[in-house]
Amino acid sequence: MRLIRSGAAQVRGEAERRGRPSRVAMLSMHTSPMEQPGTGDAGGLNVYVVELSRQLAALGVEVEVFTRAVSSKLPTSAELLPGVTVRHVDAGPFEEIHREDLPAWLCAFTAALLRAEAGHEPGWFDVIHSHYWLSGQVGLAVAQRWGIPLVHTSHTLAKIKNGALAVGDRPEPPGRLLGEQEVIGGATRLLASTPDEYRHLIDLYDAASDRVDVVAPGVDLEVFRPGDMAQSRARVGVDPADDLLLFVGRIQPLKAPDLLLRAAAELLRRDPARRSRLTVAVVGGPSGSGLEQPDALVKLAAYLGISDRVRFQPPAPQQELVHWYRAATAVVVPSHSESFGLVALEAQACGTPVVAAAVGGLRTAVADGVSGLLVSGRTPAVYADALDRLLRQPRWRARLSAGAVAWAGGFGWSATAHGVLRSYRHALSPTAVAV
């Protein structure tokens, strides 16, 4: 049963008659779209929220993104983009809180969100779109209070992560498993990024297949596009003659940057003459259970005897990151699991082949043998084999580069927004199941 605030039912009916929402409340409790991807809890989810909101606004849908305030100096609201407002919600101390500790502040976030919305006219929002299970928990409560549908994107699934844990990584706690199950069971519509995730939601979480929409994330094809490799190498300080192997992302066990370092060491063991022309770059910052990882990676590089061939760079904004992609000979994505893998898509859009783990969404993001290589197995040797093939065959690499641009070209954010908007329309349908 819905608890519908006075006036909300009439406005909801208007949205149903229009067949599309006018305003969407986007929930991203644990990480702000204004944060720099690649550090802390900021990553692909942040990019997703920003770019989806941008495209929805371009389609005439107003978006308000609600996120937890981590500083008293943050404004209550800020315009992120035309038609997109970020609301900083007071819930818990004004500081970063480990994601594992955030469930304690769900009630406070929910209450603050309800207070913030009370300043609007009744029925202001037509749809709630929650991101990650924490926001989904808030979304369930708020959707019932407002009498509007909840659309949920998981981004990652605890059961999948726990089934592919890295050494030194912590399993997702029982509280998340239970909370995630509740959100998946209670949302009006679910968005899956890939056919794999669609099957996981149905097979592992008992989601009804007719409530799940498959909509792939996108890439900003205006920013991430081919460019002059020599110019980009000069900008990031890489020798024009080097083979550059690039890792981009949060430094945490799940992303497995250590596997790239071990594979590079294996390449040099097999061919010591390659040493003078091989560079490995790791662009990103620590996150979650990987807080000790940067120091550990530095020590690992020293242990492997490749410190002189490895560069550690802080997270870079898109305008700088694009030059790293263009400068790279190959981008390596050796993750234990990925719901999609936006880094792989961004790299390919720049014309750089990707060598990625054959897991999860990477099997959708990378076309094996067309835009890059998918690697089965998690040993340094199998990654070294794939990288060696790529480095020794420049003509084949050039074909992969062309294939990468063509493949990524099919993943624009505009297509993502239209797919999400279709899901919103389904959620607004009079036949949609109530939260």
Curated annotation (Swiss-Prot):
Pfam families: Glyco_trans_4_4 (PF13579), Glycos_transf_1 (PF00534). Keywords: Glycosyltransferase, Magnesium, Metal-binding, Transferase. SUPFAM superfamilies: UDP-Glycosyltransferase/glycogen phosphorylase (SSF53756). Transmembrane segments: none annotated. GO terms for biological process: mycothiol biosynthetic process. UDP-N-acetyl-alpha-D-glucosamine binds at Q36, P37, G44, R250, K255, E338, E346. GO terms for molecular function: acetylglucosaminyltransferase activity; D-inositol-3-phosphate glycosyltransferase activity; magnesium ion binding. Mg(2+) binds at Y325, R326, A328, T352. Its EC number is 2.4.1.250. Residues 1-23 are annotated as: Disordered. It catalyses: 1D-myo-inositol 3-phosphate + UDP-N-acetyl-alpha-D-glucosamine = 1D-myo-inositol 2-acetamido-2-deoxy-alpha-D-glucopyranoside 3-phosphate + UDP + H(+). InterPro entries: Glyco_trans_1, Glyco_trans_4-like_N, Glycosyltransferase_grp1, Mycothiol_biosynthesis_MshA. 1D-myo-inositol 3-phosphate binds at H30, D41, A42, G43, G44, L45, N46, R99, Y132, T156, R176. It is an enzyme of class 2 (transferase). Catalyzes the transfer of a N-acetyl-glucosamine moiety to 1D-myo-inositol 3-phosphate to produce 1D-myo-inositol 2-acetamido-2-deoxy-glucopyranoside 3-phosphate in the mycothiol biosynthesis pathway. Homodimer. Belongs to the glycosyltransferase group 1 family. MshA subfamily. This is D-inositol 3-phosphate glycosyltransferase. The gene is mshA.
